[in-house]
């Protein structure tokens, strides 16, 4: 028995089986390669069967179907040794177990039907063979159990017959030269016949494709001569003698004897038998259509010499007929082309006509190929390709090929006319395509013109201009929903709680443009004239009782960045000085609101008071006290010109009193301010509580106060109230 199996071959076979049984489409070429590997006995048939069984038990139904199809291909082409493993109890019981599985392990309906179909077809093909009888027993058992099989197909036993390498025969002497085998004269087996030979009689090597062996293997000299000699038929009796001593069945003996012949090695394969059957069926169909020649009664009576003479005669007659047929077909082709093109153009021109018109009927396709004729042409081309690898003279022994050649020769005029019709259709469709492309291009251009006109009309009225941007400034607008909220000047005098900048980092203040871009605030112009146009959203301060409900949105109205450099005090007084004389003549002296800012009846008292308290009260006159929780620095309103000359003497002390302490007492209410300003105050007052400055803030880090701000609250106001 052969011993050239290896684990590497089994591993390669497993990989090929996994690739062939994937969930993708079936690969017929790979299936045939696997069957050739099994037939050539490169791997053990039991290992191949177990690999297929493992893939059949897969959970994926697509993989199971592919594995079943591969198993069927291997059964038909794998040889008798593989059929014995398929008919074993191990494989068949596995299929029956899949059929009887219930619950989650129940097979897919398609897989179940495929298993039943394969068991039925294998049982019918193996009928009459003792070594494959277990398949028939399983089939009958399933029938008795009530399984519904598909309709019985007609399967011949030759469907599972395939040529496989023969079993090796053991002998003590060379079966050709009768030399005994010794330690130096080794024993070798011929892969073609399986007999034992020594080195001298088996030194040749040949591939054996009829046995599924594609690589060159060892053969004896007799088999080498028979396989390579194209016309030699000698040695047939010896071949029969050896095969009869080796096989027990007449069928296997016949196969072994015929496999020695160069032509019979391929013709007697099951595939060639199927091909012969297909040829016969196609010829019968040709006869039914009465377009072919009649098949001879006995095709085996054709001799090579008669066949060659008939081929030459037919070729000569066909040349003259072919010339006449080609000339007639060309004339008909031109006429048919013109007629068909005119009919198509007429149909396209009458598209817009009424539906009651007679429908267009295509010309009769008298010269169109029938499916049977097209199949015969393809079959003839396939046979011609296969004859390239056959020994010479094979074409003479195949009368079916000659019959196909005769029937296809009569189809040449049809092919020519069909080609003409196709070309005319192609030209007409090209013309229609060109017209359609032109119409589409004109339509696109018209749409573009309409769109451009529509957009041009809209642009005339200026609708496509961008919307004007609202002027943005460094100060946010006041909330219009709170008209009674106090303004910036009122916050200054009412003493409302403001943000304390001592709790915020230095670099978090938003940068603002320089103060020189804005007009200085004039208290009299804000009271008499219209508001400054630089602040259109700011309302005039209203002295109402709702001063304590100022919204926090007003807090960042006058934010001053720490990066700004405050202008000097004299320069600020000079900026505010020109606006004061202009508004002084028109200032109403009898206005109670204006009396809050300056009292005409007490100018001398204020001047005298400021002259007496200039050394100590300079920080309070020039800057209001800032509470701890304020949100922004509020710019103070300008002061009357009467207090302007006092400012130069106050400048040196302002550098030390720039930032008031956060521990300062809260400011007094609004009405206390007005009472304190309208009544004379005693010159005695308390000194400032604390003059410490915060580290990291210098004089330039805070904005300078206007020079003529009204006098804020005095620390001794309570004494004045007590006197009142």
UniProtKB/Swiss-Prot annotation:
Biased composition (Low complexity): 566-581, 602-619, 641-658
Gene3D superfamilies, per database record: 1.20.5.1940, 1.25.40.90, 6.10.140.100, Zinc/RING finger domain, C3HC4 (zinc finger)
Location in the cell: Endosome membrane
Residue ranges with Basic and acidic residues bias: 228-238
Signal peptide: none
Membrane topology: Peripheral membrane protein
Keywords carried by this UniProt record: Endosome, Membrane, Metal-binding, Repeat, Zinc, Zinc-finger
Residue numbers spanned by region Disordered: 228-268, 286-312, 462-714
Record field: compositional bias (Basic residues): 239-256
Start-end of FYVE-type zinc fingers: 168-228
Name of this chain's protein: Vacuolar protein sorting-associated protein 27
Organism: Neurospora crassa (strain ATCC 24698 / 74-OR23-1A / CBS 708.71 / DSM 1257 / FGSC 987)
Gene name as annotated: vps27
């Amino acid at each position: 028995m052969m011993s050239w199996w290896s684990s590497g071959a089994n591993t390669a076979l497993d990989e090929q089986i996994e690739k062939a049984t994937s969930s993708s489409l079936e690969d017929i070429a790979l299936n045939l390669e696997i069957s050739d590997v099994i037939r050539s006995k490169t791997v053990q048939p039991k290992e191949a069967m177990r690999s297929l069984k493992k893939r059949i038990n897969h959970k994926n139904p697509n993989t199971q179907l592919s594995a079943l199809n591969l198993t069927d291909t291997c059964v038909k082409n794998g040889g008798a040794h593989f059929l014995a493993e398929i008919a074993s109890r191990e494989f068949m019981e596995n299929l029956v177990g899949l059929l009887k599985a219930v619950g989650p392990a129940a097979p897919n309906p398609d897989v179940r039907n495929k298993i039943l179909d394969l068991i039925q077809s294998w049982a019918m093909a193996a009928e009459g063979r003792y070594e494959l009888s277990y398949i028939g027993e399983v089939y009958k058992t399933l029938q008795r159990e009530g399984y519904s099989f598909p309709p019985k197909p007609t399967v011949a036993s030759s469907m599972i017959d395939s040529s496989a390498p023969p079993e090796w025969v053991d002998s003590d002497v060379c079966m050709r030269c009768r030399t005994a085998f010794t330690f130096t004269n080794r024993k070798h087996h011929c892969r073609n016949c399986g007999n034992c030979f020594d080195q001298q009689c088996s030194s040749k090597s040949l591939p054996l494709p009829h046995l599924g062996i594609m690589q060159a293997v060892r053969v004896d000299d007799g088999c080498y001569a028979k396989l390579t000699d194209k016309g030699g038929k000698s040695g047939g009796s010896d071949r029969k003698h050896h095969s009869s001593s080796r096989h027990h069945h007449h069928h296997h003996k016949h196969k072994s004897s015929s496999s020695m012949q160069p032509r019979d090695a391929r013709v007697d394969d099951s595939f060639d038998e199927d091909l012969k059957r297909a040829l016969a069926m196609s010829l019968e169909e040709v006869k039914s259509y009465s377009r072919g020649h009649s098949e001879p009664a006995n095709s085996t009576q054709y001799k090579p010499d008669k066949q060659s003479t008939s081929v030459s005669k037919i070729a000569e007659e066909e040349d003259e007929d072919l010339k006449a047929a080609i000339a007639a077909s060309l004339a008909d082709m031109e006429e048919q082309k013109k007629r068909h093109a005119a009919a198509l153009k007429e149909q396209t021109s009458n598209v817009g006509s009424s539906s009651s018109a007679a429908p267009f009927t295509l010309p009769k396709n008298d010269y169109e190929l029938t499916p049977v004729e097209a199949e015969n042409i393809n079959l003839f081309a396939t046979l011609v390709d296969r004859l390239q690898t056959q020994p010479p003279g094979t074409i003479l022994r195949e009368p079916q090929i000659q019959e196909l050649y005769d029937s296809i020769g009569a189809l040449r005029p049809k092919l020519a006319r069909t080609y003409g019709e196709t070309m005319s259709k192609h030209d007409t469709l090209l013309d229609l395509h060109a017209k359609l492309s032109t119409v589409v291009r004109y339509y696109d251009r018209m749409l573009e013109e309409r769109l451009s006109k529509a957009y041009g009309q809209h642009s005339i009225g200026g609708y496509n201009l961008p919307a004007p941007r609202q002027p943005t400034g460094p100060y946010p607008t006041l909330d219009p929903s709170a008209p009674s909220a106090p303004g910036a000047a009122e916050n200054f005098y009412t003493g409302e709680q403001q943000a304390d900048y001592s709790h915020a980092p230095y670099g978090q203040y938003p940068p603002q443009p320089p103060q020189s871009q804005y007009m200085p605030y004039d208290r009299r112009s804000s009271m008499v004239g219209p508001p400054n146009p630089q602040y259109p959203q700011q309302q005039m301060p209203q002295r109402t009782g709702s001063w304590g409900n100022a919204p926090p949105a007003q807090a960042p109205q006058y934010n001053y960045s720490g990066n700004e450099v405050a202008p000097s005090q004299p320069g600020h007084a000079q900026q505010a000085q020109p606006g004061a004389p202009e508004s002084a003549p028109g200032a109403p002296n009898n206005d109670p609101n204006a009396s809050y800012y300056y009292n005409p009846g007490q100018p001398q008292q204020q001047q005298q008071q400021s002259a007496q308290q200039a050394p100590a009260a300079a920080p309070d006159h020039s800057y209001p006290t800032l509470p701890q929780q304020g949100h922004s620095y509020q710019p103070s309103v300008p002061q009357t010109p009467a207090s302007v000359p006092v400012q130069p003497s106050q400048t040196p002390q302002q550098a030390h009193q720039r930032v008031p302490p956060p521990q300062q007492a809260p400011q007094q209410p609004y009405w206390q301010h007005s009472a304190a300003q309208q009544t004379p105050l005693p010159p005695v007052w308390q000194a400032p509580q604390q003059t410490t400055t915060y580290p990291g803030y210098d004089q330039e880090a805070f904005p300078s106060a206007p020079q003529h701000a009204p006098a804020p609250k005095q620390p001794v106001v309570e004494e004045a109230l007590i006197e009142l």
